[in-house]
């Protein structure tokens, strides 16, 4: 039985970041589904509708001269992407049995081995496990597959009966978690067998993430602003469980997906257009960009869905919208107006601080006190 915690506090006391429109990756609506930051932190691979694949700089995402236009030679929609842990290649999952490999060395995008096994199935999710020996694909029909270039695709069995919405693998263990529309949450063990967690089928799960390598847990995000921790049993994955359900009713909109944040955090995407940072180590959620801030900043872009977010440092990174807009964000800087009052305060502080320091030195120095008394007595004479 899951305990549901209603109305937990979400830290939204002040503005967290400043937003700036950098550019767009194209002069038309490219229909970006998602993206992923390479493990080396240098590039971001974007995928989208009608075989769209595009590589951009992670540090200078607004600079179109650094882009690499890729050709997939496919017109099927691409739904997910996952980099290999060594950053040399990435796998792409798409509709109608599409499974592609991007190679960094020559920027080629080619069909992987063994796609005949998934022909006709729409692949919705893909993720490499931490060892980099196998990747897992999930389908809109609920099927789950393991993949390696040597063996191709092998069905895991014990499939879900609804769409796989997300797969995320722990960074220290060869354990992966799975979210679904209506089949609950699952855990894939080291031997590729799937175990479904009881009591999780009643929610609509939109994504899952394992952001903190120091914790033996992941987190699932559900429709209705609901979130739950997945407690991994690293010895026997079938004994993995969930924590208490949390429902963030004070937020506007709804959870739709997530991205990996900086320093072991998750960035939750909300519709229509907002982000929330979740820190699993402290079990704290903080509004990063509110829907009100986004609307005040740009009323047109605020109506577009967030497809991917990444950070190069805490609260410093980029947002990609489904249309292809590139939005940078930086920590919010409070500007102090340079008035006569603030100038007077600064002068007073600059004068008083040295005096306080000298006073403390005098109070703690018997030698200086004796010298002062000697001088004072001489003057009195």
Give the residues covered by each predicted segment.
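Residue-level hotspots at or immediately adjacent to binding/recognition sites across diverse folds
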Residues: 12-381
């Amino acid at each position: 039985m899951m305990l549901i915690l209603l109305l937990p506090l979400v830290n939204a006391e002040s503005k967290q970041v400043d937003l700036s429109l950098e550019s767009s990756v194209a002069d038309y609506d490219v229909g970006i589904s998602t993206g992923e930051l390479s493990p080396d932190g240098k590039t971001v691979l974007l995928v989208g509708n009608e075989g769209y694949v595009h590589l951009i700089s992670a540090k200078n995402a607004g600079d179109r001269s650094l882009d690499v236009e890729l050709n997939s030679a496919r017109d099927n929609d691409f739904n997910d992407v996952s980099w290999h842990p060594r950053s040399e290649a990435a796998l792409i999952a798409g509709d109608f049995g599409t499974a592609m490999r991007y190679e960094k060395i020559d920027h080629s995008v080619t069909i992987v081995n063994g796609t005949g096994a998934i022909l006709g199935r729409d692949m919705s999710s893909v993720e490499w496990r931490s060892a980099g020996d196998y990747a897992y694909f999930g389908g809109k029909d609920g099927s789950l597959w393991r993949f390696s270039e040597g063996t191709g695709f092998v069905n895991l069995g014990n499939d879900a009966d609804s769409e796989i919405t997300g797969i995320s693998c722990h960074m220290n263990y060869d354990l992966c978690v799975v979210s679904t529309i209506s089949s609950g949450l699952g855990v894939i063990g080291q031997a590729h067998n799937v175990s479904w967690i009881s009591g999780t089928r009643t929610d609509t799960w939109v994504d899952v993430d394992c952001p903190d390598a120091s914790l033996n847990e992941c987190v699932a995000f559900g429709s209705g602003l609901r979130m739950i921790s997945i407690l991994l049993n690293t010895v026997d994955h079938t004994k993995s469980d969930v924590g208490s359900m949390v429902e963030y009713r004070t937020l506007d909109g709804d959870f739709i997906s997530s991205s990996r944040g900086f320093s072991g955090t998750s960035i939750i995407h909300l519709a229509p257009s907002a982000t929330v940072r979740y820190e699993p180590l402290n079990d704290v959620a903080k509004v990063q960009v509110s829907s009100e801030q986004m609307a005040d900043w740009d009323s047109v872009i605020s109506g577009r869905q967030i497809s991917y977010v990444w950070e190069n440092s805490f609260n410093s990174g980029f947002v990609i919208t489904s249309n292809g807009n590139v939005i940078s964000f930086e920590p919010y800087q409070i500007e102090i107006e340079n008035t006569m009052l603030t100038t007077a305060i600064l002068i007073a502080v600059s004068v008083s601080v040295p005096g306080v320091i000298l006073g403390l030195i005098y109070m703690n120095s018997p030698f200086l006190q004796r010298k002062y008394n000697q001088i004072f007595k001489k003057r009195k004479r």
